[in-house]
């Protein structure tokens, strides 16, 4: 790849990043994608409010998306403060627009953000907060999920004519990467995405 091609690849337009980010249903994943793509391309790093703010925003968003220890409302307040500082202090429009995007995303649904602070991703896109499980009532034991899984996360035996006593299909959570390939090939939609933390338990606190 030529040097010219590398420069073109790096200089991704902010408009394209925004468009791709907005394809994500989860607000946290939307903001995280935008920030990571901005860091990887358009950010020049010439002013501190933008460069340091974007790195800090990424750390805070990862904390929220993974529901790391002690994550709380202070992370949201920090992100809003970072966004404001980027709008005020960034030298270029790119930094200011990134700050605006962070604030707009976080304030578009406080309920969804608060659910993340409780360990729940309502859109089921934060992979650390979800699990893939096989519904035995819908599973026809065709074995397609087993064949497509690259991580040996699925165990079970494919149904064969005139035989009985099968090992039911199951997803081993420690091996599962939540890539979603098994969901795509399942003909009966037997693979369900669930939150690892029950919403009713959170709301009752």
Predicted regions and their residues:
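Poly-acidic low-complexity segments
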Residues: 26-27, 72, 135, 144, ...
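Ferredoxin-like iron-sulfur electron-transfer modules
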Residues: 33-41, 81-84, 119-141, 155-178, ...
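Short pre-active-site segment immediately N-terminal to redox-active cysteine/selenocysteine motifs
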Residues: 43-46, 91, 138, 174-175, ...
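Extended aliphatic helical segments
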Residues: 28, 35, 71, 133, ...
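Iron-sulfur cluster-binding cysteine motifs and their immediate structural context
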Residues: 49-59, 97, 144-164, 181-199
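Cysteine-cluster motifs in flexible loop/terminal segments that predominantly coordinate metals
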Residues: 44, 142-145
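Redox cofactor-anchoring modules in respiratory/redox and cofactor-processing assemblies
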Residues: 1-131
